């Protein structure tokens, strides 16, 4: 079992916690991590691109010249693709780029990135994040105490609304509940701060 320090909000050590090696100490699988990141990024694409094909372009209802006798190539509409102002051939249309990878593969990717954070000493476990009221400065001070003043992902309990509201104004801080933890956000974060109770919940879901 891998042991890490559990810190208080002031940065002092409160205790130690044993992490499940099946979740936080596996050999990272870079190929699966890549698959998971690409899947999430594809799902974020809006896919609202669109152009007009010959059926959507206005005009062109009349045959521009007679079929035979002019010496020109036959044409049925001035909105055919070869004409200026005509429709686009095989242009992009609105679509969803979302796709899914297997659940076990995604779980392996999540365990891989969590293990990588532990190996890189970028995981901070805090005993609790409790605030009397939502206040950005208080939250910022706690992150400074935890040496997490760069791009930080904070994972909290479901009911920790004060912590979630306190971090909304901080540009480089993202707060989410345990159920929302995902590969892309963990990869993008420089530091990963997790409340101790959330560690147990993550291990219960992935072990």
Swiss-Prot record:
Highest taxon of the lineage:
Bacteria
Keyword RNA-binding listed: yes
Where are the annotated segments for Disordered? 49-75
What are this entry's molecular-function GO terms?
rRNA binding; structural constituent of ribosome
Give GO BP annotations, semicolon-separated: translation
Q: Name one GO cellular component term.
A: ribosome
The protein's UniProt keywords, in alphabetical order, are: Ribonucleoprotein, Ribosomal protein, RNA-binding, rRNA-binding
Function as written in the Swiss-Prot or TrEMBL entry: One of the primary rRNA binding proteins, this protein initially binds near the 5'-end of the 23S rRNA. It is important during the early stages of 50S assembly. It makes multiple contacts with different domains of the 23S rRNA in the assembled 50S subunit and ribosome.
Q: Which family does it belong to?
A: Belongs to the universal ribosomal protein uL4 family.
Listed PANTHER family: 50S RIBOSOMAL PROTEIN L4, LARGE RIBOSOMAL SUBUNIT PROTEIN UL4M
- UniProt subunit comment: Part of the 50S ribosomal subunit.
* Protein name according to UniProt: Large ribosomal subunit protein uL4
Which species is this UniProt entry from?
Leuconostoc mesenteroides subsp. mesenteroides (strain ATCC 8293 / DSM 20343 / BCRC 11652 / CCM 1803 / JCM 6124 / NCDO 523 / NBRC 100496 / NCIMB 8023 / NCTC 12954 / NRRL B-1118 / 37Y)
Gene that encodes it: rplD
């Amino acid at each position: 079992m891998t042991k890490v320090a559990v810190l208080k909000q002031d940065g002092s050590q409160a205790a130690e916690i044993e992490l499940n090696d099946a979740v936080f100490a596996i050999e990272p699988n870079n190929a699966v991590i890549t698959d998971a990141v690409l899947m999430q990024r594809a799902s974020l694409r809006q896919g609202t691109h669109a152009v007009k094909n010959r059926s959507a372009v206005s005009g062109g209802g009349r045959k521009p010249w007679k079929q035979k006798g002019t010496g020109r190539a036959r044409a049925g509409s001035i909105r055919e693709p070869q004409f200026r102002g005509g429709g686009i051939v095989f242009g992009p249309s609105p679509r969803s780029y979302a796709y899914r990878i297997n659940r076990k593969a995604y779980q392996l990717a999540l365990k891989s990135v969590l293990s990588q954070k532990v190996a890189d000493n970028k995981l901070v476990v805090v005993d609790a994040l409790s605030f009397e009221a939502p206040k950005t400065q208080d939250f910022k001070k706690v992150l400074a105490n935890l040496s997490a003043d760069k791009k930080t992902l904070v994972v909290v309990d479901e009911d920790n609304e004060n912590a979630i509201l306190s971090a909304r104004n901080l540009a480089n801080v993202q707060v989410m509940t345990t159920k929302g933890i995902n590969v892309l956000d963990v990869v993008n974060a420089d530091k990963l701060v997790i409340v101790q109770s959330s560690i147990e919940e993550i291990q219960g879901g992935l072990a």
